[in-house]
Amino acid sequence: MKKHGVLNSEIASVLASLGHTDTIVIADCGLPIPAGVKRIDLAVEIGKPSFLDVLQVVADDMAIEKVTLAEEVINNNVEVNKEIELKLIEPAFEYVCHEQFKEHTKKAKAIIRTGEATPYANVILHAGVIF
């Protein structure tokens, strides 16, 4: 049994398979998941697990070069946007409109669906390198 890091076998496998610039998405329970993209559904009920809890665990285990968010989060979910900026202080941040964000999710290696039920609580994590 693993002692550290992500215990979910699907998430651990996706993280281990990422190459430089590959992307994964951590999403609220309402984000549409495109056909053909791996869905890792963690949602058990509204709010559980939370977007921020899942983001923290994944971020602790992943080299992140860039973060993409929907620009709508700035005004519509101030708390989540602030927490993302506090948790992810090193990567570059990019904001795009929500429609562009959804287009970008089509290229993700996986989308991790949380139980989060607040607006625009979604992030695309772009893999960096550890060297």
Curated annotation (Swiss-Prot):
GO terms for molecular function: D-ribose pyranase activity; intramolecular lyase activity; monosaccharide binding. It comes from the Bacteria. Substrate binds at residues 28, 98, 120-122. Its EC number is 5.4.99.62. The active site is at residue 20. It is an enzyme of class 5 (isomerase). It is found in: Cytoplasm. Keywords: Carbohydrate metabolism, Cytoplasm, Isomerase. One of its GO terms (biological process) is D-ribose catabolic process. GO terms for cellular component: cytosol. Pfam families: RbsD_FucU. Pathway: Carbohydrate metabolism; D-ribose degradation; D-ribose 5-phosphate from beta-D-ribopyranose: step 1/2. Its main location: cytoplasm. It catalyses: beta-D-ribopyranose = beta-D-ribofuranose. Belongs to the RbsD / FucU family. RbsD subfamily. Homodecamer. Catalyzes the interconversion of beta-pyran and beta-furan forms of D-ribose. This is D-ribose pyranase. It comes from Bacillus thuringiensis (strain Al Hakam).
